[in-house]
Structures are given as structure tokens and as C-alpha cells.
Amino acid sequence: RGLGDVYKRQVVDRARSMLERDKNHAAVLIWSCGNESYAGEDILAMTQFFHAKDPSRLVHYEGVVHNRAFAAITDMESRMYAKPWEIREYLESHPKKPFILCEYMHDMGNSLGGMESYVKLADEFDQYQGGFIWDYMDQALRHTDALGRSVLGYGGDFADRNTDYNFSGNGIVYADGAEKPAMQDVRYWYASPADRAAQDAANAAAAAQADRTLAEAW
């Protein structure tokens, strides 16, 4: 829960180790205090350490959504899987902090629908900073099944119990790097509005040509 002094020294030491390891990497833009650990004095101490040692970077922590008394922990409003209308409500309240989805669009199975509702928020609100898809790649291991086929195996495929079965299969690419159908949607909505418009026009022209070809065939 991040409360009390029992683990404060340990969590600040973890923050220090991460900062010293990664501080010279140009790709590091934001320090994170952790994931799904509520909020309290211990986590606040991590933020204070980051701000003191590296004021050039922001600090992120989602857990304050469960304990607003420690809102100072994070430099941005962060949520997991917030609904588009919830985000809009926040952004329309003239907030002091930008909004970011630290997890969204959980891509398990044939999913990832509705991305449009999130991406279009960026066209309206400068404070909407987008989100991080959960996640990029399935966690799976290639093995030979009972029929002798080489397949990607998940929980339960290795005589392991208990298991979450295919819950680890939530990426936009398979474990071997092959793209899932959802990648088409990601590629489209992550393009610029101008590129999306050009793609729509090209698709409309192709559909019209197909209709003419079909009519001529009849």
C-alpha cells in the first residue's frame, strides 16, 4: 500500500538503482514509481527522490487514482482502461495535469475495437497524451502439440496447473512477431489525420472500381 516507514528505504533504493542505471538513456522521458501499488508516503518518497536527483524528467504513477491525498506523487493524471467519456470529463474540467492512459486497448483474442474514440480525443485536447496498448507481443513458447504440430503454447499447454491459460496472449503481434489483425487498426488510427483521409479516399476509389468491375461482369 505504500504506507508507513517499513519499506521506505527499500523503495527509494529501488528508485535510485533504476535512475543510476537508466539516467543517460535519451529514450527515458518519464520515471515510474511502480505499478498497481495504491499510494502513500513510501511512493511519495520515491517521487521526491526523482525530482531532487533529476528535475529534467517527469514522474508517473497511476495508483493515486485510489488515494487522492497523494496526488503530488505523479506529474500527470494516469488511468488504466478509463472510458473515453471519463477522459473527456476530466479534460473538460480544465485540469492542471495532462492525461495519459498507462494501459488501454487490452488486445486479448479478437479485440481492440473502439480505438477511434480514444485517438480522436487527441484531436480535441492538447492535454490528452495518448496511451500505452496492453500489450505489444503475446507471451508464448513454441512447442510440439499432441498432433505433432509446431504451435505457440500458452498456460496449460505444458501440463501446468493452475494457469490463466491464454491470458498471456494479449499482444498486437504473436509471440513469433507475426502481426495480428488488430495491427491493421492500430496502424490506421496511429497515422496522422491527413494520412487517414488519404487512405480512406484510396479505399473508396478501390471499392468504386470493384463495383464497376462487378457490374461489367454481369
Which positions does each model-derived feature cover?
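Extended substrate-binding grooves/exosites of carbohydrate-active enzymes
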Residues: 1-218
